[in-house]
Amino acid sequence: MFGTMEIEEVAKALSSDTRLKIIRLLAEGEASAVSVFKKYNERFSDRRERATIYRELEVLYKSNFLVKTYREDSKEIVYRLAARSINIDLITQTVSAGP
């Protein structure tokens, strides 16, 4: 899942308050980009444009924090967390999925 992702990559992916809030939303369960966009703007005072939410979802996906799946029944792509937690090895400075 995370493979040999380095601490710098994780830090960069998690350095955005918007991305951290998206992770918080997806901790409640999988959701489409449109659903994340709507929930984000309902729940948080720092409203974001749809393009911003889509871009941040892709950053999290490319950083292996999210899994992206196409739902045949609803004809949409949904995102979910790839892992509930991560482990950081300070000696090798790598990151892996937690238990």
Model features per residue range: what roles?
Residues 1-24:
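Short alpha-helical segments that sit at the start of domains
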Residues 15-16, 71-92:
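Short, cationic-aromatic polyanion-contact patches
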Residues 17, 25-35:
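Short capping segments at the starts of secondary-structure elements
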Residues 34-45:
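DNA-recognition alpha helix
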Residues 46-62:
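Short amphipathic alpha-helical interaction segments
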Residues 61-71:
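A short, conserved structural fragment
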Residues 92-99:
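Short acidic DE-rich linear segments
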